[in-house]
Amino acid sequence: MKIRINDLARELEVKSKAILDALTKVGVTEKKTHSSSIEDHEAVLVKKYIHEHGTEESPRRRSAGEDEFKPKIDLSKISKPGDVLKALTQKAAPPPPPPPPPRPAVKAPSPVSQEPRPPAVPPAPQKPAVFARPASETVHTPPEPPKPRFITPASVAAQRPVITPPKPPVPPAPPVAVAPPAVIEPAAPAEEPKAAAPATTAPEAPEVKAPVSPERVAPAADTGAHVTAKPEAPAAPGAATPAPTPGRPLPGVPLRQQTPGRRMIVPQTGPRPVYSAPPPAPPRPTPPPQMSQGAGTRPGMPVRGQPIFQRRPQSGPGGGSGGPGGFQRPGGPPRPGDRPRGPHPTRQFPSGPRPMGGIGLAPPGAPANKPAGRPAPARRPGQRYVPRGQKEGPMKGFVPPPRLSLSNEPLPITRNITISEGISVKDLAEKLGIRAKDLIARLLARGVFATVNQTLEASLASEMANHFGASTDVITFEDQLAQETAKAAGETPEEAAANAVVRPPVVTIMGHVDHGKTSLLDAIRATDVAGGEAGGITQHIGAYKVAIGDPNSPAFGREIVFLDTPGHEAFTRMRARGSKITDIVVIVVAADDGVMPQTVEAIDHARAANVPIIVAVNKIDKPDAMPERVKKQLADRGLMPEDWGGNTVFVDVSAKQKTNLNLLMEMICLVADLGDLKANPDRMASGTVVEAKLDRGRGPVATVLVQNGTLRTSDNFVVGNAFGKVRAMFNDRGVSLDTAGPSTPVEIIGLETLPQAGDQFTVVADREKARDISEYREGRAREAQLAKSSRVSLEGLAEQLKTAGQKDLPIILKGDVQGSVEVLNDLLSKMSTEKVKITMIRSGVGAITESDVLLASASNAIIIGFNVRPERKAQELAVQEGVDIRLHSIIYELQDEMKKAMLGLLEPIIKETYQGRADVKDTFRIPKVGTIAGCQVADGIIKRDSHVRLVRDNVVIYTGKIGSLKRFKDDASEVRNGMECGIGIAGYGDIRSGDVIEAFTSEKIAADSLH
């Protein structure tokens, strides 16, 4: 059974702290609180200890007087609210003490000090009042009912009755100022009276001072009458001891300690000492009126402790210049009959600020020149002191952050850090060794609102790092992953090199179109890839892995990866991309054609990629083959054959006859061995996207070349702006794979979106990290596209004005693979001229869909499909909307058709043919016909259906058609040179003698050029 410490404290009527202290005394070492529980035997020990030793009271409780602890009042018989007050009154009123027997007068105990002194000064009255009757009249008050005994200064001093001698003429008393309660007025020095007067003391009587009691000073009981407080003095020597007053002890009798009753709360500001009258102050010079506010202040300014409005009272009774309480002239005596008037509560005391302070007055001991301001609130009893500026409660200990303007100065650069693209605020703060909220505050001052997980641009991250004293090296996300992987593996560069193994070389085949690149690859792979290409032309990159199967070859069993690139001039980007991911470039040149433009371009790409070049001279089986001419042409381009003393390998091959194919592969392996191609298969995979396409049944599909590490199914990866998870992998022959080592081309499924060809492929362990990087890159690409499309400049405006009359041909392009779409985009954009501009509305990979048809209908565009077909519903919708869909599989045909479409947009050309000229000899007017010109044909022939121009003074006046042509009175179809005729111009009659009429014909012909 357990008992709570709170319950035990209430049972023993002690505080919980006493229980906790007793627990330590009885041997309980376990830490307890007031809400903890203890066992029964521990409670017994605590009770025994408290009964034997008691509890330690607090210093405040020990220092409290006996009267602080009052007995309780029994409220069990209370039935209505009035009984509570009655019980309190009975409890507080002690029984009156029995009257003491009469005894002779004795000297007052120590509280009364009798010292011979000149004129005695009575103690100041406790509550001065204005005399309502003559000063000599004594006011008798009825006896007071029994009240609680309070120790007052008056009760300590000897109480004696006032002896009233005969009443001589009383001189006018000095004016006594009336002050509010709790303010002690100093009494004027007592003058020696000629005769005894009430409230006066004989000259030889010693002064009686009332000691300052530490107890509370009780105010006098209100009897309902105006009482004139008079100072009491000791009786003359030999005077009889007066009878005791009811309710008061005899003089000199010590007070009997009474039983403590209920403490009464008396509203007092503090103990009031009794002051004796100060000596008369010397007269002070009257200050000038304008300086009455106080020294050092401007006239009219309010002064601390002075009334705000120092107005001069008006004359008249109670306020006139000489009336009672009226304005007193400075330094002048009061007029006879004037009654004193109390000062304003905020007016300074005549001798300075009051000792006890007050509203608007300086407290005792305060400096006189304390600046004015709002007074500090007084602390409640028991409230501890809290320094200004410190917070309490839930905000205790909170330190506000420094103002942003205080840390605008950047720190000196003392270190270097490496950051990646799209670094988050949290990661950057960790690299800088600062708190994330400090970095966010700096970004906020920069005008950037960012959260902890928000990514930052590389430029902004570098700026923030420089501000906090660090320089930066920006790397890509793939480089960062490679560094983290190497760091996690804990390998040194030497160990990493030792763990690397030889990988198959990646060979890219380049050359001019129709020089036999794909046929050569087919002969090596023993397949027919070229037969499947449209028109026998390779139009996208193909990746294949081939193993040397000739047992007689020294390279038997080795593998080679081949990349087949297009040879058409439009596929420059594909060739450039293929050269970047390759180890060796094989330039295929036809022996009968020689070096062609795309051959030179392929050589330039290989040199730019700094990869070795092998030349394969194909078609040597043809009768007109000239391999030596090819060597000479390439030697002029800088590729010197080995048999001519150079370092370029030349191999004469025939794809059709399969001649020297093993020799070509052996040379490839030899050059690869010189390059020391190695990779670490134990790392996470990384590579490059060769091609990407959108499959109808499988979704986005990408052909990836693994360059390092091993790719496995279920791996998460990032590739450009896309990310995904490897759902399945297939090799170049369509066989499913679970793993793919270095230098292995695979087709992967599991992409969220379609990547771009040439993007870096990297496997990551965290899918969320891959998603964040993908979203960051996609957002950056979108922002760049919007900025590019919305940018307006003066040059752009001038270009728009220049091409205001330019025709626009909108196109929607769909292709089978991403590489082909990129190539066609570049090709069509280059076909734009000053007269016709091709606008690409949308381009993408996949079949033609209904959304493509609707977009084409809204924008009046033509849909072009390259190696793709429209869906059935899309075809029906295109017929309904009247959208033109053009399908192509060969790039040449697409290029020719686009030229025809562009020419069809141009306006037809108007061609004029000159026929003849006639001179006007005279004119005459025929009613209902108009003006007829009598002409003579001077040159050529004038026909009835000809167009004519009327020329006057070598200026064309009118152009129209012949309305009538007559020879004499007969209509004529034509009039030849030298003959006269009458010519009427349709709709025109202002013909004059001497004009010339020229006849011509016009015809429209189609534009034959785009320039």
Curated annotation (Swiss-Prot):
Residues 49-152, 187-407 are annotated as: Disordered. Keywords: Cytoplasm, GTP-binding, Initiation factor, Nucleotide-binding, Protein biosynthesis. It comes from the Bacteria. One of its GO terms (cellular component) is cytosol. Residues 316-329 have a biased composition (Gly residues). Residues 105-115, 187-212, 228-242, 361-380 have a biased composition (Low complexity). Residues 564-567 are annotated as: G3. One of its GO terms (molecular function) is GTPase activity. GTP binds at residues 511-518, 564-568, 618-621. Residues 511-518 are annotated as: G1. HAMAP family: IF_2_B (MF_00100_B). Belongs to the TRAFAC class translation factor GTPase superfamily. Classic translation factor GTPase family. IF-2 subfamily. One of the essential components for the initiation of protein synthesis. Protects formylmethionyl-tRNA from spontaneous hydrolysis and promotes its binding to the 30S ribosomal subunits. Also involved in the hydrolysis of GTP during the formation of the 70S ribosomal complex. This is Translation initiation factor IF-2. The gene is infB.
